[in-house]
């Protein structure tokens, strides 16, 4: 789990929007990217992010 104070400082490198932690990923709803967290370290590289499925978490 990422420290709450650190999470408030982190932003998506593509959109500069805030991130939220879901499991072992940091999610950017603006850019539609999920950044992995490996061994407690967020990997905030666009080329390492996966694209979110459109509408997968919205009803």
UniProtKB/Swiss-Prot annotation:
Domain of life: Bacteria
InterPro entries for this protein: Trm112-like (IPR005651)
Organism: Vesicomyosocius okutanii subsp. Calyptogena okutanii (strain HA)
Protein family: Belongs to the UPF0434 family.
PANTHER family the UniProt entry points to: PROTEIN PREY, MITOCHONDRIAL, ZGC:162634
Pfam families given in the database record: Trm112p
Protein name per the record: UPF0434 protein COSY_0767
Any one annotated GO CC term: cytosol
């Amino acid at each position: 789990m990422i420290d709450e104070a650190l999470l408030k400082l982190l932003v998506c490198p593509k959109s500069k929007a805030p991130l939220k932690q879901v499991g072992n990923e940091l999610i950017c709803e603006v850019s539609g990217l999920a950044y992995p967290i490996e061994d407690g370290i967020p990997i905030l590289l666009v080329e390492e992010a996966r694209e979110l499925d459109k509408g997968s978490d919205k009803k």
